[in-house]
Amino acid sequence: DGQGGFWPGIEKREVPDGASMDDYTLPQELLLPVAGPVTSGYGFRDNPVNGADDFHAGVDIAAAEGTPVAAAQSGQVVRTGYNRLRGYYIIIRHEGSVQTLYQHLSYIFVRGGETVTQGQTVAAVGSTGLVTGPHLHLEIILDGVRVDPMPSFPQLAA
């Protein structure tokens, strides 16, 4: 069929609505919120909690419980909250239709509506929600669509 890239007999998986595997360019540079190894990348994976084949809409960065989490860029806190999957989380809106989402936090130091600066400590790494251990789950949302954070943080690929 000329499409290539797929093994015969392997079914093509569709990226879920609200996510993209396409290349993108952000209007500003982002700061890595926490240093550590990537334990789960963006895209299709075997879920480490339940073994299901699913789409992971962010990257997981391992770090010790309580490690400070910095705002990737200046912006306004859209929402903070808790749910059983994300645990404690923060969404920050930045210029250029960019949002960053930080999940599985142990503590949140900011409130909805607050303005934050790049590098400001906004939370602490935790293991809340559906997790196997302490880490930061980080997502980048561009124009309402989740994109792979790895190209924005080349130090994660090292």
Predicted features along the sequence, with ranges:
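Surface-exposed, glycine-biased beta-strand/turn segments
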Residues: 2-86
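Generic beta-structure capping elements
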Residues: 41-43, 64, 93-95, 105, ...
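Active-site acidic-Proline motif in GNAT/NAT acetyltransferases
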Residues: 63, 107-108, 112
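Residue-level recognition of beta-strand microenvironments
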Residues: 41, 80-81, 108, 125-128
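Short, well-structured beta-strand-loop connectors
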Residues: 68-78, 110-125
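Zn2+-dependent peptidoglycan hydrolase active-site motif and core
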Residues: 54-57, 71-109, 134-135, 139
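Glycine-centered loop/turn positions within well-structured domains
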Residues: 59, 67, 100, 108, ...
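Conserved, short, structured surface segments that act as functional micro-motifs
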Residues: 88-94, 101, 114-158
